[in-house]
Amino acid sequence: MLRSHAAGSLRSSDAGQQVTLAGWVARRRDHGGVIFIDLRDASGITQVVFRDPDVLKQAHRLRAEFCVAVAGLVEIRPEGNANPEIATGDIEVNASSLTVLGESAPLPFQLDEPAGEELRLKYRYLDLRRDAPAAAIRLRSKVNAAAREVLDRHDFVEIETPTITRSTPEGARDFLVPARLHPGSFYALPQSPQLFKQLLMVAGMERYYQIARCYRDEDFRADRQPEFTQLDMEMSFVDAEDVIAISEEILAALWALIGYEIPRPIPRISYADAMARYGSDKPDLRFGLELVECSEFFKDTTFRVFQAPYVGAVVMPGGASQPRRTLDGWQEWAKQRGAKGLAYVLVGEDGELGGPVAKNLSEAERAGLAGHVGAAPGDCIFFAAGPAKPSRALLGAARSEIAHRLGLIDPQAWAFVWVVDPPLFEPADDATAAGDVAVGSGAWTAVHHAFTAPKPGYEDAIETDTGNVLADAYDIVCNGNEIGGGSIRIHRRDIQERVFAVMGLDNAEAREKFGFLLEAFTFGAPPHGGIAFGWDRINALLSRVDSIREVIAFPKTGGGVDPLTDAPAPITEQQRKESGIDVKPEPSKPH
């Protein structure tokens, strides 16, 4: 070893010892003929002092981020010079030798000062020398170990599944890989290990897990990555309760790493209730502000805007004092979300209603409105009217925006909830509008994925009452973030083919795309279910950072670009030729 001790391990009890340290020059200070450096390695920082004339002469060349090895004597710092801010603050190392292991060019940014994200990602290897980014990556390693410990204790088998496979429709676009030895054909990078983990259940593995890399060629979104990680699990001979129980045990182990005990059992809410009360299928329960159903209240209204299939409201405490400019800003905020605007009523301190909507209401409506929605004098009532789904979504977004503007969210709080019993299907147009890829050509597509089982008792309604079929599925939400989603799977070929048919995949197309899975279901497939946790999002929450990029060693930007390697990049003509990427497949001959 080039060093005898880790820099952050030295204490006053080590005084008098000769040590050798290796690391980076975090800071250099010159004081009256003596040079001090803060020597940093992965364990922490130790102050090194250069007094010996020969070593001092060498130390004059040191600059920030030089990589060095230093030998010397551990000494107690002079009285008054201790630094209680660092663990090694009682001691310093009086250097007797110095070796420069690697010089550093002038830094593109100072490691102890803020820097732009693109610059940080371009020089990510420097960014990771900083305390916070390094701590996030190290915590991620502990998170992996904690999850594995729980799963190993429950006899799960860690199994790797293929990362180049067949392109199968799963709700997003595939990344395609040309198959050089089969010109005109392509592999796909997996969007998830979904099909393989189900096949492992057919294979009798019974309990599988994997910390899996997944790939989705999605449109650019602010906090998405084209490659991401999930903790993937599957279990045979289980129901939803079994999967939820072990999931809660894993989550408890993860949050214990940061000293938080998750209250168990984690509460549950149905998808329908979540949408009705919070306007979101991933509600943030750190604050109240529930939506109020107003359709019945306005059933006889003469106000045309409220003559709609759904009318709902959310109350902004103290919002009546907002200036007109701010209220106009809410209209722009709503329009950016695809709405025409955000109707509002102001409740005056005397209880009188104001604002443009109030004058369109009947006397009875004005008299009863504040009581119906729970508004007090000085509050602002925001409304949405129209089809229920987009109207609730708008109010749900307004609810979150109100909470942020009023500081109602405790940043130290944790609020977990299971969202259960979602619909099995949604209109394909809704999925497309949300940026997903509808599987099949039918009017309906799967809310989760095509392999989710209907809730027991709903099998007969798949074709006849498609929109009201519930899924045997469960999502775990933390602080308004979906951090995991799972379901009991279809394990019968006949039901799987019926689900495919509703989604517009006829038997021939289903066999062409998923024939291997359908065939596997004919060989005694067991009932099975599982869950996948969004590993990047969970790590971001545990590290208390806003972006998942902070917990990925080498992330892409929001635009899918890697500033470090400048990927993606064009390939050469030779590579195009060798890969067969431009080969047009022969048209298939009729039989």
Swiss-Prot record:
Biased segments, Basic and acidic residues type: 574-591
SUPFAM superfamilies: Class II aaRS and biotin synthetases, GAD domain-like, Nucleic acid-binding proteins
Record region (Disordered): 559-591
One Gene Ontology cellular component: cytoplasm
GO terms, biological process: aspartyl-tRNA aminoacylation
Enzyme class: ligase
Residues engaged in binding L-aspartate: E170, R216, H448, R489
Site for Important for tRNA non-discrimination, residues: H31, G80
Catalytic reaction list: tRNA(Asx) + L-aspartate + ATP = L-aspartyl-tRNA(Asx) + AMP + diphosphate
Keyword line: Aminoacyl-tRNA synthetase, ATP-binding, Cytoplasm, Ligase, Nucleotide-binding, Protein biosynthesis
NCBIfam families: aspS_bact, PRK00476.1
Chain's role: Aspartyl-tRNA synthetase with relaxed tRNA specificity since it is able to aspartylate not only its cognate tRNA(Asp) but also tRNA(Asn). Reaction proceeds in two steps: L-aspartate is first activated by ATP to form Asp-AMP and then transferred to the acceptor end of tRNA(Asp/Asn).
Similarity comment text for this entry: Belongs to the class-II aminoacyl-tRNA synthetase family. Type 1 subfamily.
The protein, known as: Aspartate--tRNA(Asp/Asn) ligase
Upper taxonomic lineage: Bacteria, Bacillati, Actinomycetota, Actinomycetes, Mycobacteriales
